């Protein structure tokens, strides 16, 4: 049995809280967690992304990610676009990272995608990485 399982996200609260714990509130929302949370909900509701939580073997929420199938003018073929990945800072591990990579590959293959794209924070910047399936 796997150490982790996936469930459909019904609420984004945990993911928003983890993001703020890790990165702080963005400009314009300083001191306004509720306002930021409402903003995130509005943007994600309009995005059309599918959202999942990863649970550990005890049922604890350890990660969240949002994804959709899209395309890119440079990369030929459909792309599994992982738009957000948020990991509970207390639960990050190599095992969780491996599980996420396998989950992304599984979803890409399930939806006949040729690529997986993922955004990652690097200091004050954000980079998009593409990996062929």
UniProtKB/Swiss-Prot annotation:
What domain of life is recorded for the organism? Viruses
Protein name per its UniProtKB record: Protein 7
Q: Which organism is it from?
A: Escherichia phage T7 (Bacteriophage T7)
């Amino acid at each position: 049995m796997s150490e982790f399982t996936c469930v459909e996200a019904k609420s984004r609260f945990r993911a928003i809280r983890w993001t703020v714990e890790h990165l702080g509130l963005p400009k314009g929302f300083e001191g306004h967690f509720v306002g930021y949370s409402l903003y995130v909900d509005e943007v994600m509701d309009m995005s059309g992304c599918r959202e999942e939580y990863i649970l550990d073997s005890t049922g604890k929420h350890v990660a969240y990610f949002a994804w959709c199938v899209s395309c890119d003018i440079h990369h030929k073929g459909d792309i599994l676009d992982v738009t957000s990945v948020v990991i509970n800072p207390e639960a990050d591990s190599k095992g969780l990272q491996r599980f996420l990579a396998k989950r992304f590959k599984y979803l890409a293959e399930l939806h006949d995608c040729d690529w997986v794209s993922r955004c990652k924070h690097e200091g004050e910047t954000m980079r998009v990485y593409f990996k062929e399936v």
